Design a protein with these regions (language model features):
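Solvent-exposed interaction patches of small proteins and small membrane subunits
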Residues: 1-117
Length: 117
């Protein structure tokens, strides 16, 4: 089986971030914490982001050292293996403070990896 291209992993990350934004648009932290279906969906998207980041070539990640790639993978591992201990306020804060800048970078990477082919 052949390895997927970096451009596909970047696209996966982009789509997962867009899904998180969609799932959390127009709600408060309290709304989020009370809606199990919504926060479960968000957590799943973060798991997908972490998996895709883990599959990106190191050469791609080295071009964007301002992104905490290892932290993204570590967060995925926390969500996957410590599900019952997940602090939804931390998830919410990451959505509000870290995800927008990651999204901007992913859009740039997407344009670059798409134009390479």
């Amino acid at each position: 089986m052949s390895k997927r291209s970096d451009s596909l992993y970047v696209r996966d990350i982009k789509e997962a971030i867009e899904a998180v934004f969609s799932y959390t648009r127009g709600i408060t932290l309290d709304d989020f914490k009370l809606d199990r279906m919504r926060y479960s969906a968000v957590i799943r998207e973060f798991e997908l982001i972490g998996e895709a980041v883990g599959s990106l070539a190191d050469t791609v990640k080295k071009n964007y050292p301002h992104i905490a790639w290892q932290d993204i993978k570590d967060f995925r591992n926390l969500l996957t293996h410590e599900y019952f201990g997940v602090d939804l306020e931390i998830v919410w804060n990451i959505i509000r403070s870290d995800l927008p800048s990651l999204y901007e970078t992913i859009i740039r990477i997407d344009k670059e990896t798409t134009s390479d082919h």
